[in-house]
Design a protein with these regions (language model features):
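Substrate-binding cleft and catalytic face of glycoside hydrolase catalytic domains
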Residues: 74, 84-160, 164-176
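Ser/Thr-rich, Pro/Gly/Ala-heavy low-complexity intrinsically disordered linkers and tails
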Residues: 1-37
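N-terminal carbohydrate-binding accessory modules
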Residues: 22-95, 318, 324, 329-337
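Extracellular glycoside hydrolase catalytic/binding regions
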Residues: 43-45, 69, 76, 94, ...
Length: 338
C-alpha cells in the first residue's frame, strides 16, 4: 500500500510505501468489555502546570478521533456506541471529540434540538464506553454567539458536570481576533457559566488565528483552574515555525491540547495529499511533552485526505486497513502507540 506525499512546503513528491510503523495493526479483538476502561483507570483529569494529569498525578496524553461537523455527518460514525467501543479496544482510543457545528444551515443556531441531541448521544456513549469526550462548540465566530454558547455550556455542565469523562471546548477555531479584547472575555463568560455547575472538569480554550497563536494567549492567560489551550496543526502547512510558537507558550507555562490535526494541508487535504514525514515530527513533539490530541476526522468522505475512513466503511467499526484512507492508517498507528 502506498500514498502520495508532499514536502512541508506543499510540493508533491512521488508515491512511497508507508513505513510499517505508520500502518498500525489490523488485529481485531471486537467491541466487548475488556477490563478497566480509560476513565476507570485514570478518573478525574486535572491541569497541573503545563500538563494534563490523571487522578493519580500521572501525565495523561489523550488520543482519539474528532467527529466530522455533526451537521454534515450523514453516516453517524461518531454517534455509534459499538464503533466507539471498538476504537477503544483496537485503536486504544481514550477520547472522542463531538464537533457540533454552530453557524451552517442545519447546525446549532438553526436546529438546536438536533445538534444538542447529536452531542448528547456521543457524550452518553463515551460515558457508557468509559472514554473521555470533548464537547466542541465548532464555530469560527463564537464571540458573536456568546449568549447561545453560555446557555449551551450551562446546560451541558448541568447535565454532565458530575461525569469525569467530560471536557468542554467553547471555541473551536477563532479567526484572527484580538485575544485580550475579544477572545479572553468570551472565554471568561463561558467558563463562569460552566463553573457555576461544574467546578472541576477540564475546559480547553480556543486561541487566535485558527487556534495557532498560542503565544498570544500565553501573554495573558485566563484566570482559573483546569484550563487548557487549543493548538491545531495540519502537517503539510504547519511546520517548525508553529512548534516554535507552541514551545514559547509552554515555556511560559501554557498547557496545550491539540483538538484537531491532520497529516494534510490546512484545507483538510482536498488535494488528496498527506505529509507523513512532517506529521511524524509533530507526533514526536507531542509525545515528548505529553500533549494529547484528537485527529480530524472520523468520516468517510471521498477526496479529502483528512477523512480517516473509506466510503465503504461500516458504521459499527471493524475498520481494517481496507476501510481506511488518506491519513487513516497513520492516525490509527499513532493511537496504537504505547
Amino acid at each position: 500500500m502506498g500514498v502520495a506525499g508532499c514536502d512541508p512546503g506543499g510540493a508533491e513528491s512521488p508515491p512511497a510505501p508507508i513505513d510499517p510503523l505508520d500502518m498500525g495493526s489490523d488485529e481485531d479483538v471486537g467491541s466487548g468489555d475488556m477490563g478497566p476502561t480509560p476513565v476507570e483507570l485514570h478518573g478525574q483529569l486535572a491541569v497541573v502546570g503545563a500538563e494534563l494529569r490523571d487522578e493519580h498525578g500521572e501525565r495523561m496524553q489523550l488520543k482519539g478521533p474528532s467527529s466530522m461537523w455533526l451537521n454534515w455527518e450523514n453516516e453517524g460514525f461518531a454517534q455509534n456506541l459499538e464503533a466507539l467501543r471498538w476504537m477503544r479496544n483496537n485503536w486504544r482510543a481514550t477520547v472522542i471529540r463531538a464537533a457540533m457545528g454552530v453557524e451552517p444551515d442545519g447546525a446549532y443556531l438553526t436546529n438546536p434540538d438536533k445538534a444538542r441531541s447529536q452531542v448528547e448521544q456521543i457524550v452518553d456513549n463515551a460515558i457508557a464506553a468509559g472514554v473521555y469526550v470533548i464537547i466542541d462548540w465548532h464555530d469560527h465566530n463564537a464571540h458573536q454567539h456568546k449568549d447561545q454558547a453560555v446557555q449551551f455550556f450551562s446546560e451541558m455542565a448541568t447535565k454532565y458536570g458530575d461525569k469525569p469523562n467530560v471536557i468542554y471546548e467553547p471555541f473551536n477555531e477563532p479567526l484572527d481576533l484580538d485575544w485580550q479584547g475579544t477572545l479572553k472575555p468570551y472565554h471568561e463568560a463561558v467558563i463562569a457559566a460552566i463553573r457555576a455547575k461544574d467546578p472541576d472538569n477540564v475546559i480547553v480554550l480556543g486561541t487566535p488565528n485558527w487556534s495557532q497563536d498560542v503565544d498570544r494567549a500565553a501573554e495573558s492567560p485566563v484566570a482559573g483552574t483546569n484550563l487548557l489551550y487549543t493548538l491545531h496543526f495540519y502537517a503539510c502547512t504547519h511546520t517548525d515555525w508553529l512548534r516554535g510558537k507552541a514551545d514559547g507558550a509552554r515555556a511560559k507555562g501554557l498547557p496545550l491540547l491539540v483538538t484537531e490535526w491532520g497529516a494534510t494541508h490546512a484545507d483538510g487535504g482536498t488535494d488528496g495529499q498527506v505529509c507523513l514525514d512532517a506529521a511524524r515530527l509533530w507526533h514526536e513533539w507531542m509525545n515528548t511533552h505529553g500533549i494529547g490530541w484528537t485527529a480530524w476526522k472520523l468520516d468517510n468522505c471521498g477526496q479529502d485526505s483528512s477523512c480517516i475512513l473509506a466510503p465503504n466503511a461500516p458504521v459499527t467499526g471493524g475498520w481494517t486497513s481496507t476501510y481506511l484512507k488518506g491519513h487513516g492508517v497513520f492516525v490509527r498507528a499513532r493511537m496504537q502507540d504505547e
